[in-house]
UniProtKB/Swiss-Prot annotation:
Cellular component terms per the entry's GO annotation: cytoplasm
Catalytic reaction list: tRNA(Asp) + L-aspartate + ATP = L-aspartyl-tRNA(Asp) + AMP + diphosphate
Species the sequence originates in: Klebsiella pneumoniae (strain 342)
Lipoprotein recorded as keyword: no
Protein name in the entry: Aspartate--tRNA ligase
GO biological process: aspartyl-tRNA aminoacylation
Entries under SUPFAM superfamilies matching the protein: Class II aaRS and biotin synthetases (SSF55681), GAD domain-like (SSF55261), Nucleic acid-binding proteins (SSF50249)
Amino acid sequence: MRTEYCGQLRQSHVGQQVTLCGWVNRRRDLGSLIFIDMRDREGIVQVFFDPDRADALKLASELRNEFCIQVTGTVRAREEKNINADMATGAIEVLASDLTIINRSESLPLDSNHVNTEEARLKYRYLDLRRPEMAQRLKIRAKITSFVRRFMDDHGFLDIETPMLTKATPEGARDYLVPSRVHKGKFYALPQSPQLFKQLLMMSGFDRYYQIVKCFRDEDLRADRQPEFTQIDVETSFMTAPQVREIMEAMVRQLWLEIKGVDLGDFPIMTFAEAERRYGSDKPDLRNPIELVDVADLLKSVEFAVFAGPANDPKGRVAALRVPGGASLTRKLIDEYGNFVKIYGAKGLAYIKVTERAKGMDGINSPVAKFLTAEIVEAILERTGAQDGDMIFFGADNKKVVADALGALRLKLGKDLSLTDESKWAPLWVIDFPMFEDDGEGGLTAMHHPFTSPKDMTADELKAAPEEAVANAYDMVINGYEVGGGSVRIHRGDMQQTVFGILGINEHEQREKFGFLLDALKYGTPPHAGLAFGLDRLTMLLTGTDNIRDVIAFPKTTAAACLMTEAPSFANPAALGELGIQVVEKEAKASLENK
């Protein structure tokens, strides 16, 4: 039906007859002439109808926005005064000789001249996706997956599919469960990741695997999370962690060159401990120059319990955050930032405004200055590198609260005060994460997942001191987003059972949930390591949006609902009966529980 795409016409096509298919983006009726901007997935071209083609001109008078049409005509060069430099096709236009209205459109529920609500965009997603910016995002997503497949094929990786209907295994979030009709009372789980299957593929001898795969997690949603998401999943045998990082870094660097024309350079490597200490985050945005600076040793003897308490507590921390030019912040803004850090558990925000450092105590303004000596203030200013016009904020609490609160404040200040250089790309690897973290109930939970290997520890050493264990894990971070994460996996049965035991999974549960894995580990399992990238997050970065729903064709809301199809929906009672499932209403359930 077409010979060319609208958006691909150029001056090289001048004089050629073309047939185009697409939609009316805009129509301008000048009486004897009618102009339309005609759109398809590749872009927009101007088409005009003149009196010499009376039938086409008459039919064109009926055109309205979003009519689906076919046009045949001749490509002509525009007069120089009419060239539109803002359009890729702005140097040419198409003189229409034939017009077919394929399908008419009713008045649109979306307004192309105004910003539509996200609810409206999601409800009429098929119309929202017609917008050029949305089409461009999905085209870039397609380019990313195409590039990844080429790269992986060139490096000897095999694309192998793993099951969608599998067994529920604890991986940190709730599973989406699928009832079995054949095995009544039993359920499949949709995979949170192909983690165990890709490890089993390594045990099967497929030493380089990849898959671009859908994953599912029934968790509380955030702006950058979806219940179903796509991973670029990778696993290798007989490769060390540095070797895995090297090949995956090469892939991402080449991807950025292909999509953005940018060389990211070598990725710096930072330990988890350093990232938390300097940036209050395990995914630091290195475009932001603000850093956390420890000052507890300077404040142990002050007569100010807010500082002295954490400064003398082994589990406490006092850190300073120097904000260049921050002395200009108003009291109202300072109070707002104080309320902001309370979200992260901080009790407030002490500060020092540096107006004229050379004047010592007379050159600062601070509500806590009365508790500090001139020597302590000078030491703080020296350590933080404070200059005239700077602001120093303080966090004093347990280590986690200080890191979380000042880390979040750092990001907010970077954005609010335009300190973060958004023209740059800042990738890095974060390594050496703690193996376990406190689960809040006196036990331990895996910081990544239960199949991550500890670094340089035997099973006996791990059992004796699990809190000291460092995971052989690594995350790739770009501009403050974790775009990929992975680890060296456990490949010995005794180590895997030790980790399960530390996590409170008894032997019976181990056999019930992971018996197939423990059995597989008995038969010459090779050392293996891998990584998974979030395709959605990569696409967000490469398209310049901060909303994950902008890079997914048909996303869910933050309530895990599809406004277009109205999913989830109630199931047919007969279908539920076949599955052996009965829906219990809340009132009935409450009465049963009260009996």
